[in-house]
Amino acid sequence: MFLQIAACFTVIGLLYGLVSNLQQNRRLAASLPPGPPGHWLFGNVPPKNFPFIRFAELTEIYGPVFTLRFGRRIVCVVGRHQAAVDILVKHSAETTDRPRAIAASEMLSQGFRILMTPAGERLKKYRRAFHTCLQPSAAATYKPIQYNHAKNYILDCLHDGKCHLEHGRRYAASVVMYIGYGKTTPTSYSDPEVQEVNKCLGRLSEVIKPGAYLVDTYPILKHIPGYASHLWRYGREELALYTRQANAVRKQLEKDEAQPSFAAYLIENQERLGLSNDELAYLSGAIFGAGSDTTAAAIAVMTMAAACYPETQARVQAQLDEVVGSDRAPTFEDEEMLPEVTAFVLEVYRWRPVSAGGVPHRSTKDIVWNGYVIPKGTEIIGNLWAIGRDPELFPDAEEFRPQRWLNENGRIRDDLKYPVFGFGRRVCVGQHVADQSLFINTALALWAFKISQDPAKPIDVLAFTDTANIRPLPFTLRFEPRVKDIEAVLEAHLD
């Protein structure tokens, strides 16, 4: 009897949603930016694979901003740089919000994950907490640990280049475990706590993809007994994991054995920050979620680009030889004198952006753009893949060309920007730490090695995972030492 009643209410709810959807679509269609036609009732079908590539194709057809409709959801996809500035930067106050993400946020993350936290008091206190530990001055204090782990990455590649992807993941995991929880010993990607966190992140990458779960289009499904019950179970497992990690730091603090860390800061200031135990656990775990997989993927893209574009690699190495030489390793203090390295990093971000599809925003007011009206409640996606292929700013976009970031004096251009870390008030709070990681790993890798492809196993530069944050599929590299006694030079500088 209960199931019959539930089914009846489900049908009624779906019918109501469909009728409301039809009325809404007729009212809004005239004012929205154009887009591909869809079913008169259900709208468009979400792309099954690599949505950011399909959205980039639609940008070529319909222009800088186009509209999709998924049931009652209206989605505007932004695929050009100036349109992104006009909508997501100039209207930052009206686009700080996130759309309701029932599967990924409410069910999988129990509403605690900062990535999908809507605008409001929780987001404000989350960002206040992050600001203290990730602002530029705080990020600079992590440089010594980043430097030493980057040197270990080079030594790992020297001794076992076949596992270069694993070495990049180890670097990223070691740094974020230090920042997040104060762990000072080298971290392996195979460590149990790292594997558990990465399992959670893998689940998120699948759930957050557009169209992955019908409940995001028809919210009533959330209340159907048994629907996607595994998401609730995964959410409980994830919260338990982050709680265990935070509690371990609590015990260290009680014994006066804790290293400085983000988790320790949150615990010591929990009352002042107004954080519940669950919020604190999720927030401390967010450091790993935001910084591990993304940093490792970007390092992999850096080595891929170096191998596939040897002339570009050689240009960076010429400057490294001039500024640094071979008697010592490059350091953060050399950054100002190494614009070729910085340009290489900026091009890595643009060429293969890890968060290629961007994270959706939600408008809280009507936004007028180029005569169109993007109504309140619209989901707005800044498609980083398409924006990085804006022909007005990035001609020959598929070419990896760091020189596009340099002016006639060989310095980094002030007039060219790429929003790899997001837009407006939702920009990634860990951007400064990420920039530091990419700079020092790029400088050390190109100083130490000539990186090349294996002729028997050419690299497919489009072979990436189909996940929310993309990463290269396994590929083979050769690491030929450029510096005599690399190990001795590096170990002489290891702290």
Curated annotation (Swiss-Prot):
It is a single-pass membrane protein. It is found in: Membrane. It holds the Pfam family p450. InterPro entries: Cyt_P450, Cyt_P450_CS, Cyt_P450_E_grp-I, Cyt_P450_sf, Cytochrome_P450_fung. Keywords: Heme, Iron, Membrane, Metal-binding, Monooxygenase, Oxidoreductase, Transmembrane, Transmembrane helix. Pathway: Secondary metabolite biosynthesis. Its main location: membrane. The chain crosses the membrane at residues 2-22. PROSITE patterns: CYTOCHROME_P450. Heme binds at residue 428. It is an enzyme of class 1 (oxidoreductase). One of its GO terms (cellular component) is membrane. The keyword Cell inner membrane does not apply. Cytochrome P450 monooxygenase that is able to use 4-ethoxybenzoic acid as a substrate for oxidation. This is Cytochrome P450 monooxygenase 113. The lineage of its organism: Eukaryota, Fungi, Dikarya, Basidiomycota, Agaricomycotina.
